[in-house]
Amino acid sequence: MSEESMDTGFLVINTKDKQDKTVKKPLRILIKKSLENYFLHLDKSQCVSNLYQLVLSELEQPLLDIIMQHTRGNQTRAASIMGINRSTLRKKLKRYGMN
């Protein structure tokens, strides 16, 4: 599925603005702010080498949890929803102790 045809309209989080009003922010904006915060507070002498895996695991575990709940544990359906192979799904579930 191409990026243009994917519906990301529901990937939003309700947050509060400076006037304490509820506003919807796309998930990607919150991820970007989290990464900016990470680098802002990073000790300048630290060498970051696994940031991609760190970010991926922060997103992947709750994604798997929600999809497995949604499919009531049906791995075939879950893999289909995610667009991955069932064996790949099983590896990911095992990695996070969700098997």
Swiss-Prot record:
One of its GO terms (molecular function) is sequence-specific DNA binding. Residues 75-94 bind DNA. Signal peptide: none annotated. InterPro entries: Fis_DNA-bd, Homeodomain-like_sf, HTH_Fis, Trans_regulatory_Fis. Activates ribosomal RNA transcription. Plays a direct role in upstream activation of rRNA promoters. It comes from Buchnera aphidicola subsp. Schizaphis graminum (strain Sg). The gene is fis. PANTHER family: DNA-BINDING PROTEIN FIS. Keywords: Activator, DNA-binding, Transcription, Transcription regulation. Pfam families: HTH_8 (PF02954). This is DNA-binding protein Fis. Homodimer. Belongs to the transcriptional regulatory Fis family. It comes from the Bacteria.
